[in-house]
Amino acid sequence: MAEIYLAGGCFWGLEEYFSRISGVLETSVGYANGQVETTNYQLLKETDHAETVQVIYDEKEVSLREILLYYFRVIDPLSINQQGNDRGRQYRTGIYYQDEADLPAIYTVVQEQERMLGRKIAVEVEQLRHYILAEDYHQDYLRKNPSGYCHIDVTDADKPLIDAANYEKPSQEVLKASLSEESYRVTQEAATEAPFTNAYDQTFEEGIYVDITTGEPLFFAKDKFASGCGWPSFSRPISKELIHYYKDLSHGMERIEVRSRSGSAHLGHVFTDGPRELGGLRYCINSASLRFVAKDEMEKAGYGYLLPYLNK
C-alpha cells in the first residue's frame, strides 16, 4: 500500500475521479503545503495551502506512474494558479510526496510531459508538509451531491491509458498465415510451449514484450526476473488493464489464466510465488505469445512513448 498527494484545482472532482480508478483503495481531501500548520477552507488564501487529494493505492494493482498519468489526463499542467473556472493559489497544481523513493517515478512522468508539451510545466513537486484534512462536508462531496460542481470529466477514469483500438486483433485466417504453428497453438488454443528451450526464457535485454498477435505492449523487460521455471517470468504487466484474468481448472489444477486484452491471446498464468520484494506475483508467460522489441527499436516500431519508463 502506498500514497501520494495531488493538487489539481477543486478537490471535489479530483477525489471522485481517483476513487474510480482500479487499484485506488482510499481517497480523502485536504489542504497541503501551506505556510503554517493549521488552516481551514475559509483561510486558504491567507495560509497558502492547496486543495489536495490524498490517494492511497495498491502498488500491485496500479503503479505510481499510472496514477500520475491519470492525473495529467485531467489537469492543465501549464496553467498557473487556475484549473477550469477556479482561480487562486489554492487551486494550483502539485505533486506532494512523503517517500523520496517516489521521486524517480515522479520526475520521469513530469519530464515526459514537458517533452511532449515542449516547455516547462507549472506543476510543483514538493515533499508533503502541513497537510490538514478538510472539513467533513468536503469528503466524498460528489458521492453525496451527484449534481454538484465539478471542473473535470470524472468518467475519464474509465478510459484505459493505452487505447485498445490501436491494437486490433487480426482474423483467424491472418493469424494462421502469420504466426508459427507453435505461436498459433499457444495463443489461440491455450497450448503450453516446452520449458527452458523457448525464445525468451533467458532474455534480459532492455525493451518491451508485446502481444505477438496484435502488437499491444504487455511487459517491460525491467520487470522480468529469473524464476528458474523455464518460461519468461514477470513481476507485473505494464498496466493491469492490458491483461484479462480467468479461472483455469484444466489438468486437475486450479490456476489463473492470463490473456491479452485486445487479442485475447493465451499468455500463460499468474502465480503468487514471485519475489516478495517485487510484489509477490509471477506472471509465467509463454515466449510463443510474445514478441520482444529492443530499446533501440522501440521508437521506429511505434513504442517511443514508453521509452521514458523502461528503467523507472
Curated annotation (Swiss-Prot):
Keywords: Cell membrane, Membrane, Multifunctional enzyme, Oxidoreductase
GO biological process: protein modification process; protein repair; response to oxidative stress
GO annotations of cellular component type: cytoplasm; plasma membrane
Topology of this chain in the membrane: Peripheral membrane protein
Sequence ranges assigned to domain MsrB in this UniProt record: 172-295
Reaction it catalyzes: L-methionyl-[protein] + [thioredoxin]-disulfide + H2O = L-methionyl-(S)-S-oxide-[protein] + [thioredoxin]-dithiol; [thioredoxin]-disulfide + L-methionine + H2O = L-methionine (S)-S-oxide + [thioredoxin]-dithiol; L-methionyl-[protein] + [thioredoxin]-disulfide + H2O = L-methionyl-(R)-S-oxide-[protein] + [thioredoxin]-dithiol
Region (Peptide methionine sulfoxide reductase): 1-155
Annotated catalytic residues: C10, C284 (nucleophile)
One GO MF term attached to the UniProt entry: peptide-methionine (S)-S-oxide reductase activity
Gene3D superfamilies for the chain: Peptide methionine sulfoxide reductase (2.170.150.20), Peptide methionine sulphoxide reductase MsrA (3.30.1060.10)
Main localization of the protein described in the UniProt heading: membrane
Classification via SUPFAM superfamilies: Mss4-like, Peptide methionine sulfoxide reductase
Protein EC: 1.8.4.11, 1.8.4.12
Family from the record: In the N-terminal section; belongs to the MsrA Met sulfoxide reductase family.
General function of this protein: Has an important function as a repair enzyme for proteins that have been inactivated by oxidation. Catalyzes the reversible oxidation-reduction of methionine sulfoxide in proteins to methionine.
PANTHER family given in the database record: METHIONINE SULFOXIDE REDUCTASE, PEPTIDE METHIONINE SULFOXIDE REDUCTASE MSRA_MSRB 1
Listed NCBIfam families: msrA, peptide-methionine (R)-S-oxide reductase MsrB
Name the UniProt record assigns to this protein: Peptide methionine sulfoxide reductase MsrA/MsrB 1
